[in-house]
């Protein structure tokens, strides 16, 4: 079975569903820390203006009181990759794939199934804070490494920021996907190409119930197809020819 790891995104699209969620002990530790910080503290940590810091301070207080706006994680995050993922009007098989095979790597919640209900927040692994005297990456490392203790194929659509949360040993188990555009023989890639292609690739995997690497290599999506010569056992490269 394939499991696909995707990152969170800064951009969010919030729906109004108020509830009192269950939170893990590690998530609660982070909430307890942030809920003690002042608006000024948050301005410095996030490097944002006072108005934005007030918004984040209120979010952390809402977390503390457990009066939260909850959304399925896959629908809450709304960055470029997410906007290229099919997230609405899923068939039964697509919804099952999303629930069982797609996981989001979060600095607040850990690794969670894509349909997990979560609340809007601002936190990533580059945030300069110490939780229990550890960086967020070290704080979550054991949890992330535990997720890798299975025989499933782990496909990474993560950036380096998220992959380095895993210990080097567990990181070696990840299968990376690379997306390149061929423009008149010139191979090019950049963040916009990669983010859009990650979303399109995940959609194709979901629509085709992709469960093996051989099946993944056969997929065609948004003009991309697998290139064996540019790939190896740990990195699958997909190329899109542009005229």
UniProtKB/Swiss-Prot annotation:
One of its GO terms (cellular component) is cytosol. One of its GO terms (biological process) is response to hydroperoxide. Transmembrane segments: none annotated. It comes from Streptococcus agalactiae serotype Ia (strain ATCC 27591 / A909 / CDC SS700). It holds the Pfam family H2O2_YaaD. It comes from the Bacteria. Belongs to the UPF0246 family. This is UPF0246 protein SAK_2020.
């Amino acid at each position: 079975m394939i499991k696909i790891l995707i990152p969170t995104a800064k951009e969010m699209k919030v729906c109004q569903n108020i509830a009192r969620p269950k939170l893990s002990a590690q998530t609660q530790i982070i909430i307890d820390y942030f809920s003690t910080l002042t608006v000024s503290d948050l301005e410095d940590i996030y490097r944002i203006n006072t108005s934005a810091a007030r918004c984040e301070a209120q979010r952390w207080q809402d977390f503390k009181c457990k009066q939260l706006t909850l959304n399925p994680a896959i629908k809450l995050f709304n960055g470029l990759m997410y906007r290229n993922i099919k997230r609405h009007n899923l068939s039964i098989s697509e919804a099952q794939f999303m629930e069982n095979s797609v996981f989001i790597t979060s600095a607040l919640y850990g690794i969670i199934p894509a349909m997990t209900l979560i609340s809007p927040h601002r936190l990533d692994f580059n945030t300069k804070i110490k939780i229990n005297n550890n960086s967020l990456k070290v704080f979550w490392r054991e949890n992330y490494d535990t997720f890798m203790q299975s025989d499933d194929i782990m496909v990474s659509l993560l950036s380096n920021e998220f992959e380095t949360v895993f210990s080097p040993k567990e990181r070696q188990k990840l299968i990376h996907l690379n997306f390149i555009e061929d423009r008149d023989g010139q191979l090019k890639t950049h963040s916009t190409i990669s983010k859009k292609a990650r979303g399109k690739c995940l959609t194709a995997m979901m629509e085709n119930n992709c469960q093996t690497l051989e099946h993944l290599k056969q997929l065609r999506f948004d003009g991309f197809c697998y290139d064996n010569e540019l790939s190896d056992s740990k990195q699958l490269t997909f190329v899109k020819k542009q005229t």
